[in-house]
């Protein structure tokens, strides 16, 4: 069942070109047009299913659901608990052994603890920014949980982008995915699920949609044009204003336009 989380921060945003991480050291990217071409190639058609859109969701531990006293992480936990219970039920094809349910529920938001306690039998993509070694030099992850949510570009027998929106008058309006950058803030709709890989089981998240609410300081190593050239443009504008102010003054005195 999908759950909406926000306000959260977005990192490692991959919404324009889908990413194939089969080779972790050398990931590949492809646009929807390129994936369409691949589908028409009998040799490469099978590769399309490896391409995914994704974002890394940074969820502050003390962040609350807007207008309520409920923590966002608690809302997510309810959805995760439901997903685990479903995976252990007779209705699920995953057939999660009931003996794993307590541990999966207890450690679902700490991948490090899960790894230590279960020796890779159980996994989770959720990391605790206060204990994860990889977060030590990333202060924006401290005091927060983070996890990757993704979705195949080819799903339901067709190629589809992730729906991306911005706030509108009374309802969200569509937003070009290229307008969402690593570091921006917003809301995400995700669906937690339990997967099976060999003898291991784990928690992952489908990415359903993204709502961008505001720009944030870039986390991808780039800077916006405003940040890069803001001071220069401001100084240029002031200088231009002085020049044209002087021109206007001279015109007023002479009664003639200096531009003909």
Please give the residue ranges for each predicted region.
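OB-fold ssDNA-binding interfaces and closely related basic DNA-contact patches used
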Residues: 1-146
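Solvent-exposed residues in well-ordered beta-strands and their adjoining turns
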Residues: 58-62, 193, 213
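Broad gene-expression machinery/nucleic-acid interaction feature
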Residues: 52-54, 185-187, 202, 206-207
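OB-fold/S1-family single-stranded nucleic acid-binding modules
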Residues: 197-218
């Amino acid at each position: 069942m999908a759950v909406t989380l926000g306000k959260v921060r977005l990192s490692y945003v991959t919404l324009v070109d889908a990413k194939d991480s089969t080779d972790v050291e050398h990931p590949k990217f492809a646009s929807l047009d390129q994936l369409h071409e691949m589908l028409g190639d009998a040799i490469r058609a099978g590769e399309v299913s490896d391409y995914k859109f994704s974002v890394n969701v940074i969820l502050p531990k003390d962040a609350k659901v807007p207008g309520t006293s409920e923590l966002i992480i608690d809302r997510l936990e309810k959805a995760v608990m439901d997903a685990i219970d479903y995976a252990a039920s007779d209705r699920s094809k995953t057939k999660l052994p009931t003996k794993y349910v307590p541990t999966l529920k207890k450690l679902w938001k700490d991948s490090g603890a899960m790894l230590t306690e279960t020796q890779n039998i159980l996994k989770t993509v959720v990391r605790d920014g206060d204990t994860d070694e990889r977060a030590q030099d990333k202060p924006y992850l401290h005091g927060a949980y983070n996890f990757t949510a993704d979705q195949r570009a080819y799903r339901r027998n067709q190629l589809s982008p992730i729906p991306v929106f911005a706030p509108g008058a009374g309802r969200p309006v569509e937003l070009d995915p290229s307008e969402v950058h690593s570091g921006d803030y917003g809301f995400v709709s995700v669906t937690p699920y339990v997967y099976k890989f060999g003898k291991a089981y784990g928690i992952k998240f489908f990415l359903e949609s993204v709502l961008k609410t505001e720009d944030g300081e870039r986390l991808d190593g780039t800077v916006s044009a405003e940040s890069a050239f803001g001071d220069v443009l401001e100084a240029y504008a002031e200088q231009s204003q002085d020049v044209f102010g002087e021109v206007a003054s001279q015109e007023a005195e002479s009664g003639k336009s200096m531009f003909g």
